[in-house]
UniProtKB/Swiss-Prot annotation:
The lineage of its organism: Eukaryota, Metazoa, Chordata, Craniata, Vertebrata. GO terms for cellular component: nucleoplasm. It is found in: Nucleus. It comes from the Eukaryota. Keywords: Nucleus. This is Protein saal1. Residues 10-21 have a biased composition (Acidic residues). Residues 1-21 are annotated as: Disordered. Belongs to the SAAL1 family. The keyword Protein transport does not apply. It comes from Xenopus laevis (African clawed frog). Plays a role in promoting cell proliferation in response to pro-inflammatory stimuli. InterPro entries: Synovial_Prolif_Regulator (IPR052464).
C-alpha cells in the first residue's frame, strides 16, 4: 500500500450521537474496536513468534487499512486528544515493542508523530520515559519508512518548546543516536529520509551547541583511539564526512534538503571545534572545499540568472559562502588554493552586483514596505556581509601571478573590481590596498583606474 487510505465516512457505521469524537464524525466505538483488534493481533502472534526467529511478518491487509485510517485521523486535534485520553501512547508503545512487522511499526510511530503536533498529546508522549527510550532506539531500525516516521516524531517533539529540553537531554544520554544518524546520512539514498534527518540534526544543533560540540569532539577521540590501538579496527563514521555525503546526494534532488545540510555545516563553523573538524579532516578539507566551490560557481547565482535570484537563494548563499570563507582563513593549505579561488571572485562579484540591483528595487518599493520585505532586507544584508568578508580575504592574498591568471581567465575585470570597491570600502580598506599593490604589478592601467575610483569613494 503506497499511501494511507482516506478516513471512513460517517455512513460506514451506525453509531450513537454521543459516540462522536469532539466535533468530528469519527466514532469512539470504531477506535476502541480497531485498537483492541490490533492489540489482540499482536498479542496473539507473540507466543508463536517467540518460538521462531526474528523474521519479519506481513500485516493483515484489512487490519492495515483500518489502522491507516487511525493514522490519517490522528492529524485531527480532537482525535489526537481522544487518543491521548484513551492511553493510545502506551498502547502503541506496547505494539511497537512486540511488533515483528515493519509496516505496523511505521504506522504506530506515524500516529504518535501526528499526535505530537498538538501540545497536550506531545507532553504526554514526551513524559513517557519508556516511549522516549524506544523512539531513540528505533533510529537503528533498518526499515527506511520507520526511520522516516521516527525522525519526524523526534523533530516534532523537539519543535515544541515545552518538551524540547527533555528530548535534548535524552539525546545527550544516548551516544548511539549519533552513530545511527551518521550511518543514515552516509549510506541512505532516500531523499525524504535524508531531509528529515537533516532537519532533526539542524534543530538539535541549533538549540544545543554543547551537544553538537560533544558529538564533534568524539570524532577526534575515536580517530586517535583507532590509530593508536588497532590497525585492523574499522574507523567509526565521522560527522563531517557523513554530512558532506548527504549534502552531495541532495544537491540535485532536494533544494530544501541542500539548504538544511548547508545550514548544519554553517553551524559547525560558528565554533572553533566545528571548524577544526572540517579543515583538519584526513584530506585537509579538500573534498568539502571542492564540493562547495563547485556548488557556488556552477549552481548558484549564474550569469544568466535575473538579479532577484539572490532573494531565492539567500539562505543557500549565506551558508555556503560562510563555510567557504571560514575554511579559507583557517586552512594551512590556503596559499596552495589561491589559484582555485579565482572562479569564486567571479561568483562573489556577481552576487554583490545582484544585491545592488535588489537594493535599488527595494528602495523603489519602500512605500509598500511590509514585515516580509524587512525580513528579506535582513537576510540579503547577511549575504552581503558574508560575501564582502570572503572576497576581501581572497583579494588580500592574491599575488601578481594570481592576478595575471585571473585577468587572462576573465575572472578579474574592471567591472568586477569596481563592484568590489563599491562594496568593500571603507570597511575592508586594508584588503583593497593590498590588492591594488599586487594589481599595480600585474596591470598598471587597471590599477590606476581603480585607484582613482578609490579616491572618489573615499570622499
Amino acid at each position: 500500500m503506497d499511501r494511507n487510505p482516506s478516513p471512513p465516512s460517517s455512513d460506514d457505521e451506525e453509531a450513537p450521537e454521543d459516540d462522536s469524537i469532539g466535533d468530528t464524525v469519527y466514532s469512539k466505538h470504531w477506535f476502541f474496536s480497531t485498537l483492541t483488534r490490533l492489540i489482540e493481533e499482536v498479542s496473539g502472534g507473540e507466543s508463536s513468534a517467540e518460538q521462531e526467529t526474528e523474521t519479519a511478518v506481513d500485516l493483515d491487509e484489512e487490519l492495515e487499512s483500518e489502522i491507516c485510517k487511525v493514522w490519517d485521523m490522528s492529524m485531527n486535534q480532537d482525535v489526537a486528544l481522544f487518543l491521548q485520553e484513551f492511553k493510545a501512547p502506551e498502547i502503541l508503545l506496547g505494539i511497537i515493542v512486540k511488533s515483528k512487522c515493519c509496516r505496523l511499526t511505521e504506522i504506530c510511530v506515524g500516529i504518535l508523530g501526528n499526535m505530537s503536533c498538538f501540545q497536550e498529546p506531545c507532553l504526554t508522549i514526551s513524559n513517557n520515559e519508556s516511549l522516549g527510550e524506544v523512539a531513540l532506539l528505533l533510529l537503528s531500525d533498518p526499515d527506511p519508512p520507520t526511520l522516516l516516521e521516527t525522525s519526524r516524531l523526534l523533530l516534532t517533539c523537539l519543535s515544541q518548546a515545552e518538551v524540547a529540553g527533555t528530548w535534548a537531554e535524552r539525546f545527550r544520554k544516548h551516544p548511539s543516536v549519533r552513530d545511527n544518524l551518521c550511518f543514515i546520512m552516509y549510506s541512505s539514498t532516500n531523499v525524504d529520509l535524508l531531509l528529515k534527518v537533516g532537519q532533526l540534526l539542524d534543530r538539535l544543533f541549533d538549540m544545543d551547541e554543547d551537544l553538537m560540540l560533544s558529538w564533534i569532539q568524539r570524532d577526534f577521540r575515536e580517530s586517535n583511539s583507532v590509530t593508536d590501538n588497532a590497525e585492523d579496527t574499522a574507523a567509526p563514521l565521522e560527522m563531517v564526512p557523513c554530512l558532506l555525503e548527504a549534502t552531495k546526494l541532495l544537491r540535485s534532488e532536494s533544494p530544501k534538503g541542500l539548504d538544511t545540510y548547508l545550514h548544519i555545516l554553517h553551524l559547525l563553523t560558528t565554533t572553533q571545534i566545528g571548524t577544526q573538524a572540517i579543515v583538519q579532516s584526513p584530506d585537509g578539507g579538500e573534498e568539502m572545499w571542492e564540493f562547495l566551490s563547485d556548488l557556488t560557481c556552477n549552481d548558484l547565482c549564474q550569469p544568466n540568472d535575473p538579479p532577484l535570484v539572490v532573494q531565492e537563494q539567500k539562505s543557500l548563499l549565506s551558508s555556503v559562502l560562510a563555510v567557504l570563507s571560514t575554511m579559507f582563513v583557517s586552512q594551512e593549505k590556503q596559499r596552495q588554493r589561491r589559484e582555485r579561488t579565482l572562479p569564486l571572485i567571479s561568483s562573489l562579484s556577481r552576487v554583490l552586483e545582484n544585491l545592488e540591483e535588489c537594493q535599488k528595487k527595494c528602495s523603489e518599493d519602500k512605500a509598500h514596505e511590509s514585515p516580509d520585505v524587512r525580513q528579506d532586507d535582513f537576510y540579503l544584508q547577511v549575504v552581503k556581509d558574508v560575501s564582502c568578508e570572503f572576497l576581501s580575504n581572497i583579494l588580500s592574498e592574491l599575488s601578481k601571478d594570481d592576478i595575471l591568471q585571473g585577468i587572462s581567465l576573465g575572472h578579474i575585470t574592471e567591472q568586477r573590481c569596481l563592484c568590489a570597491l563599491r562594496n568593500l570600502l571603507p570597511l575592508y580598506s586594508q584588503s583593497v590596498s593590498s590588492f591594488l599593490v599586487a594589481l599595480g604589478e600585474a596591470d598598471r592601467t587597471l590599477a590606476d583606474t581603480l585607484q582613482r575610483e578609490t579616491s572618489v569613494l573615499a570622499e
